[in-house]
């Protein structure tokens, strides 16, 4: 049978106290809405309709081209939100999943199980439920002696007996598509909130003697709806635990998984060692047998095998096999480090390519440069790439030796096998195999220091 999905993403999220629409707040690096959409994709819906409202344009940008959008200009409840999808889904045959966009922990596996349960039991509606240790505040699932769902009763309306029920409504449902939109025509706003409730549809089905079922989640965490920053932090914690556990199952070692942040799209090969306080974000990929030490931060970068990154930052760059970086190095966007490069402490690389086996051990800036293989940068080397208006490129060939405290002012090229003397300021090209000395000649004035007031003999 054909599946459809409706994602409810129109709410403002007042309790978040944010200008950002609630569903766009991030968990593990992507928005809650994206988490929900990815999970919904597991049921392979023929059509997905996302209901937007508050700051609709921002929400639509996140899933542009991936879903149909309809707008709920007035926030008149969950039932009203689902009504907005009628022009897209009416008269279609199949079952429709209705899910809130602020439930980032729900998994695709659970949604597939929900759909299968709905079909196998020939229900007109199926409620996704969970068993809560503390059900206070949730709608309760009331069943009869045959374990059939009778109704959903809200906390404020529940009797003393009903308040003892642990099974709660998660706010996710599957409906026979045609019957859903027929029933929506019969709900009203005769309630304390003056809104159209999707739960009223369940009551209509029961009154008609139609079959309503409930599928219970195995993991209560999946039911979490995020309405404030406290719940957002809870979702982040649960998602981080899931992600790290999966990496450990796949052969990655964590010194302290509770103090490690790995984004949902990060890929890590087996035999990688991750120490505490490491952050990996975006589309980062880490190769096998790499070591990431305490405090390392990597975003949208590809790291090769057998590399060692020590307490350093790497952004939007590529690092090949056998490279060592840090401590306290910064590899900025647009950089690439070839095999066996060493970038040491307090070295910054920006928008540059560095060839195999090149070494910049300490206190060096390499910007907008193309550096060959087997180059050695002495301590304090600076490529000067900016004149206040434009940035210029430095080209350094293979097997070049740059002495300490040298300043290389771009645009300039150092030829293969050339050598720059320590303390030089280079403003012109250096031919291959040449030695460049760009510093003032040293002059020694004998006994001149004795004339100075601080000399020992003058005290």
Curated annotation (Swiss-Prot):
Entries under InterPro entries matching the protein: Bifunctional_GlmU, GlmU-like, GlmU_C_LbH, Hexapep, Hexapep_transf_CS, NTP_transferase_dom, Nucleotide-diphossugar_trans, Trimer_LpxA-like_sf
Reaction catalyzed: alpha-D-glucosamine 1-phosphate + acetyl-CoA = N-acetyl-alpha-D-glucosamine 1-phosphate + CoA + H(+); N-acetyl-alpha-D-glucosamine 1-phosphate + UTP + H(+) = UDP-N-acetyl-alpha-D-glucosamine + diphosphate
Matches recorded under PROSITE patterns: HEXAPEP_TRANSFERASES (PS00101)
Binding positions for Mg(2+) per the UniProt entry: 102, 227
Biological processes per GO annotation: cell morphogenesis; cell wall organization; lipid A biosynthetic process; peptidoglycan biosynthetic process; regulation of cell shape; UDP-N-acetylglucosamine biosynthetic process
One cellular component term from this protein's GO annotations in UniProt: membrane
GO function terms (MF aspect): glucosamine-1-phosphate N-acetyltransferase activity; magnesium ion binding; UDP-N-acetylglucosamine diphosphorylase activity
Compartmental location: Cytoplasm
Pfam families: Hexapep_2, NTP_transferase
Binding site for acetyl-CoA: 379, 385-386, 404, 422, 439
Chain intervals for the UniProt region annotation (Linker): 230-250
Chain positions covered by the region annotation N-acetyltransferase: 251-459
Keywords: Acyltransferase, Cell shape, Cell wall biogenesis/degradation, Cytoplasm, Magnesium, Metal-binding, Multifunctional enzyme, Nucleotidyltransferase, Peptidoglycan synthesis, Repeat, Transferase
Signal sequence interval, chain numbering: none
Active site, renumbered: 362
Positions contributing to UDP-N-acetyl-alpha-D-glucosamine binding: 8-11, 22, 72, 77-78, 139, 154, 169, 227, 332, 350, 365, 376
Named cofactor requirement(s): Mg(2+)
Biochemical pathway: Nucleotide-sugar biosynthesis; UDP-N-acetyl-alpha-D-glucosamine biosynthesis; N-acetyl-alpha-D-glucosamine 1-phosphate from alpha-D-glucosamine 6-phosphate (route II): step 2/2; Nucleotide-sugar biosynthesis; UDP-N-acetyl-alpha-D-glucosamine biosynthesis; UDP-N-acetyl-alpha-D-glucosamine from N-acetyl-alpha-D-glucosamine 1-phosphate: step 1/1; Bacterial outer membrane biogenesis; LPS lipid A biosynthesis
Subunit structure: Homotrimer.
Family statement drawn from the similarity comment of this UniProt entry: In the N-terminal section; belongs to the N-acetylglucosamine-1-phosphate uridyltransferase family.
Protein name, as recorded: Bifunctional protein GlmU
UniProt organism field: Streptococcus sanguinis (strain SK36)
Taxonomic classification: Bacteria, Bacillati, Bacillota, Bacilli, Lactobacillales
Designated gene of the protein: glmU
């Amino acid at each position: 049978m054909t599946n459809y999905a409706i994602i409810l993403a129109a709410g403002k999220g007042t309790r978040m106290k944010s200008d950002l629409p609630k569903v766009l707040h991030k968990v593990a690096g992507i928005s809650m809405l994206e988490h929900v959409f990815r999970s919904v994709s597991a049921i392979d819906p023929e059509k997905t309709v996302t209901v937007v409202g508050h700051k609709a344009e921002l929400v639509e940008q996140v899933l542009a081209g991936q879903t149909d959008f309809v707008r709920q200009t007035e926030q008149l409840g969950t039932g009203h939100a689902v009504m907005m999808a009628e022009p897209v889904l009416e008269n279609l045959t199949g079952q429709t999943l209705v899910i809130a966009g602020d439930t980032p922990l729900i998994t695709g596996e659970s949604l597939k199980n929900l759909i299968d349960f709905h079909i196998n039991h020939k229900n007109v509606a199926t409620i996704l439920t969970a068993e809560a240790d503390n059900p206070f505040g949730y709608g309760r699932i009331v069943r009869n002696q045959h374990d059939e769902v009778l109704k959903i009763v809200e906390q404020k309306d529940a009797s003393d007996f009903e308040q003892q029920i642990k099974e709660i409504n998660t706010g996710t449902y599957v409906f026979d598509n045609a019957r859903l939109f027929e029933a929506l025509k019969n709900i009203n706003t005769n309630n304390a909130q003056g809104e159209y409730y999707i739960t009223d549809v369940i009551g209509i089905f029961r009154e008609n003697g139609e079959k309503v079922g409930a599928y219970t989640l195995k993991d209560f965490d999946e039911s979490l709806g995020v309405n404030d920053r406290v719940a957002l932090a809870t979702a982040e914690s649960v998602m981080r635990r899931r992600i790290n556990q999966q990496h450990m199952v796949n052969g990655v070692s964590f010194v302290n998984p509770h103090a490690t942040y790995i984004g949902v799209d990060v890929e890590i090969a087996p035999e990688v060692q991750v120490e505490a306080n490491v952050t990996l974000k975006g589309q980062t990929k880490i190769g096998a047998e790499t070591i990431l030490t305490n405090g390392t931060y990597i975003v949208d970068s590809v790291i090769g095998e057998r590399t060692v990154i020590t307490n350093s930052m790497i952004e939007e760059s590529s690092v090949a096999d056998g490279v060592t970086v840090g401590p306290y190095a910064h590899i900025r966007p647009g950089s690439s480090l070839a095999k066996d490069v060493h970038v040491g402490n307090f070295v910054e690389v920006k928008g540059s390519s560095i060839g195999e086996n090149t070494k910049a051990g300490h206190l060096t800036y390499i910007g907008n440069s193309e550096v060959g293989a087997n180059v050695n940068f002495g301590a304090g080397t600076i490529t000067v790439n900016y004149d206040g208006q434009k940035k210029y490129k430095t080209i350094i060939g293979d097997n070049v030796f740059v002495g300490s405290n040298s300043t290389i002012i771009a645009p300039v090229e150092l030829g293969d096998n050339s050598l720059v003397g320590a303390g030089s300021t280079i403003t012109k090209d250096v031919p291959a195999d040449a030695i460049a000395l760009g510093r003032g000649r040293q002059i020694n004035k004998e006994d001149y220091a004795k004339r100075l007031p601080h000399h020992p003999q003058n005290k």
